Curated annotation (Swiss-Prot):
GO terms for biological process: long-chain fatty acid import into cell; long-chain fatty acid metabolic process; long-chain fatty-acyl-CoA metabolic process; sphingoid long-chain base transport. It holds the Pfam family AMP-binding. Its cofactor is Mg(2+). It is found in: Lipid droplet; Cell membrane. Activates long-chain fatty acids (LCFA) by esterification of the fatty acids into metabolically active CoA-thioesters for subsequent degradation or incorporation into phospholipids. Also facilitates the transport of LCFAs into the cell, either by active transport or by decreasing the intracellular LCFA concentration. It may supplement intracellular myristoyl-CoA pools from exogenous myristate. Preferentially acts on C12:0-C16:0 fatty acids with myristic and pentadecanic acid (C15:0) having the highest activities. Also involved in long-chain base (LCB) uptake of sphingolipids. There is a cross-link at residue 189 (Glycyl lysine isopeptide (Lys-Gly) (interchain with G-Cter in ubiquitin)). This is Long-chain-fatty-acid--CoA ligase 1. Keywords: ATP-binding, Cell membrane, Fatty acid metabolism, Isopeptide bond, Ligase, Lipid droplet, Lipid metabolism, Magnesium, Membrane, Nucleotide-binding, Ubl conjugation. Optimum temperature is 30 degrees Celsius.
Amino acid sequence: MVAQYTVPVGKAANEHETAPRRNYQCREKPLVRPPNTKCSTVYEFVLECFQKNKNSNAMGWRDVKEIHEESKSVMKKVDGKETSVEKKWMYYELSHYHYNSFDQLTDIMHEIGRGLVKIGLKPNDDDKLHLYAATSHKWMKMFLGAQSQGIPVVTAYDTLGEKGLIHSLVQTGSKAIFTDNSLLPSLIKPVQAAQDVKYIIHFDSISSEDRRQSGKIYQSAHDAINRIKEVRPDIKTFSFDDILKLGKESCNEIDVHPPGKDDLCCIMYTSGSTGEPKGVVLKHSNVVAGVGGASLNVLKFVGNTDRVICFLPLAHIFELVFELLSFYWGACIGYATVKTLTSSSVRNCQGDLQEFKPTIMVGVAAVWETVRKGILNQIDNLPFLTKKIFWTAYNTKLNMQRLHIPGGGALGNLVFKKIRTATGGQLRYLLNGGSPISRDAQEFITNLICPMLIGYGLTETCASTTILDPANFELGVAGDLTGCVTVKLVDVEELGYFAKNNQGEVWITGANVTPEYYKNEEETSQALTSDGWFKTGDIGEWEANGHLKIIDRKKNLVKTMNGEYIALEKLESVYRSNEYVANICVYADQSKTKPVGIIVPNHAPLTKLAKKLGIMEQKDSSINIENYLEDAKLIKAVYSDLLKTGKDQGLVGIELLAGIVFFDGEWTPQNGFVTSAQKLKRKDILNAVKDKVDAVYSSS
C-alpha cells in the first residue's frame, strides 16, 4: 500500500471538487501555533523562542568596509560599428560576521519598540511603520521592535519602484519609514505624495567621517536628506542607532504594549508583476499559524546547531516566515546578499557562504539555476580525465539512488568535496520556494551538495501551504501540506482540469489565510469565498501518496491557435535548465500554434559554442559574446539544443519552441524586468524585444 502523507477530512462538497485534505499528523484539526508553544501573537512567539535559547547566537551580519569599483574596456557593436565601451563592476569588501545572542536580541527588540514610541508612533493599528529596505539584521530588528509595541508594519520591496511605493504609503497612511541610506534619494517624490509620513529612520548614521567610496556614500545620503527637508520640512529624520539610544534612555518611561491575536501584524505588498501592488493583511494569528504549520514539516530535522543563511527579500513572506522559523529552531541567522554570496564577487575577504558556513540555505529557482550553471562551468574547465571521473561518479551515484541500491548517497563525496567547500562545506538542506524549479536542477543540486526541499505558499497564506518533509523526499513535487492548512482542488473546466482526475485549482483554508486585501473589497471578494477558502489561481494535482504537485498558474496558461493550452512556467522551468540559458521568458501569441523563447544567455558556455562554430576567435573574452547575439548560426545552434532539452524532459508538440531571440542584458529588479521575488515582468520583457519576436513568428 502507498504511504499517505495527506488524508481526506470529510467528503467532497460536490462532484466539481476533491475531498479536502490535511497533513496526516493534523487529521483531527489544523495547527494554529507552533508545536510546544503557547503563543497567539508574533511578540509572544519570539519571546518564547528567545527565552528558550538565551545565550546562543541569534543572528550575524557583516559591515561594508568599502565598495571597490573596477572598469574594463569591451568591444561592443553600436549602430553596426565595433566600439570600445567601458563597463564598471562593483565589488564589496566586508568585515567578519558580528553576532547578537537571543538575550541581546530581546533587549534590542524592546529598545527599538520604545524608541519608536518615543519619536511619536502610537501603539495601535493606525500608526504604521513602513519597512522599505533590503534584507538585513536591522530590518528584522525594526520589525521585532514594532511587534513589542503593537505597531503594525507595512512591507515594500526595496525595488518596488516609485509608483508602487507611493501607492503603499498613501493607501496605508504610514507614519514612519525605515530605509537604507542608498534608498534615501528615492524618497524625495514619495514623501511629497504621502503626507502622513512624519518620520524617516535610515540604516546608518550619516557622517562626513564615512570615507567609503571616497565619501560618495556619505554625500549621496547627506544630499538626499537635505532635498527631503526642502520638500517636507516637517519630517524628522533619525538613524537606527538614534532609535536604539532613545529606547534605552526611556526604559523606565515607556512600557511594552503587547498586541492581541486579532490585531494587525503587517500589511505585505505584493511585488506587482501585473497591475498595482495589493496589500495583503496579516493578523498576528495568521502569522503565528503560518509559522506553526511550516514548523511541523521539518521539526525533527533542524535545531539549535543549525546556521541559516538569509538573503532573499524580507518583504517577501517566504523569507519572513523562514527567519521566524529559525528563531523557533534556535538556529543562528547569517545575513547575506546575492551580490556577496561567493568569494568571486568580493574583494579582500571571503564570500558570505564561505565566511558563515551555513547548514541551511533558502533560495528561489533563479538562484539555484545560477548555482547549477556555475558548477557546470567549473566542471567544463576541468582536465579531461578529472572531468571523466566526475561524471562517472555522478552518474553512478544517480543510478544507484534511482534503483535504491545502498551506498549511493555516500558515493562521490570525495569527488564533489570541492564543490561543497565553495558553499561553505556544511550545507545539510536547501529549500526552494517562490517559483517552480526543473526536476533536473533539483536532482543535480541534491546529488552534488545536499537535499533540495521544495516549498509552496503565497503571501495570502502566510507562505505556509506545503514543504517537502525530508523523511518523505521526492523529486518534482511541492510536497507535504503544512500543519495549518486544509486544501482541496476545484474544477477549472475551461482549461480541462477536473477534480475527478485529482486536478484543479488549489483552494486553501486555515488560520494562516489572510482575511482581506487592504482597502480592496473587489480583489478580496474575487479571491476569498464567503466561507473562508482562498482561491490561489494555481493548478494542482494530488499524487497517489497525497503529495501536492503544482502544474501551473491559471493566468500563465495560454490558449494557442489550435485551441490547446500551454503552461508558460512549466516550459520555463524546463528550458531554463539548458546550459546556454541564464534566464528565459516564454511568450505565446494566441494567434500562433507554438511559443517563442526570449533568452538571457549564459555567457561562458555560449562563448565556447561560438568559438567551436568559428563565430568568435579563440582569444575573444566571454564579455564580447554580446556582439554575436544576432548571429544566425549561433541562434540556430542554441535553438536546436533547446529543442533537445525540451524533448529529453518530455515536452511535445505545441510545447516545443517555434524559435528564440536573445535578450542583450540581464533581468534584474533594478532595471524592471523581474520583481524582487525574481518573477518575470512578461509585458516589459516582450515590449523590449517585440520586433525580434514578431520576426521569429514571421519566419517560422
